[in-house]
Amino acid sequence: TTNIYGGMHSCSLLEPFVKLYKLTAEKNYLDFSEYIISTGFSKDQDIISLCKTKEKRPFEFNHTKAYEMMSCFEGLLEYYKVKGDEEDLKAVVNFVDMVLESDYTIIGCSGCTHELFDNSSVKQTNYSEGVMQETCVTVTLMKLCARLLMITGDSKYADVIERSGYNALFGAVNSENQTMKRALGIVWKGKEAVPV
């Protein structure tokens, strides 16, 4: 999948390497973190720079994998805590602002096409039988907003956590012991889970 999404998946492990540096002070971890950041999170587009300038919204990037992209920005935020470069914080804040403007649905999730940013704020009312608004995207957005809330103190991030938690996250909980046979495309009472 690294080739499919421009290397974004591989870049999403930035956060653990920054944390390893914080725990050990081993410069190799910091150097590797800085290498990941130097890629701009994608082999064919500098997503970090695009977020600093708000030139394009996340659904307009060459690669739009929501969970991995947000994980990359979680790592950049952790790096900001180490180095204190306000430009890094600006990139993360702008990224989340753009997600909330273009890819945040009424229930508090993103990605009406699987787990991809796809202008969900507009597309959320389109009929679809496909997989959409995956829980991994909800949880990662909530985590990123929790970190921004701690750093900035801006209550808008608490609002996102609340909306996403009470709607998208709790709505995804299977409290009825329902089973799913994904390989067969059947879930619960014979309804298709994935169009076949």
Identify the role of each PLM range.
Residues T1-V196:
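Glycan-recognition and catalytic cores of secretory/periplasmic carbohydrate-active enzymes
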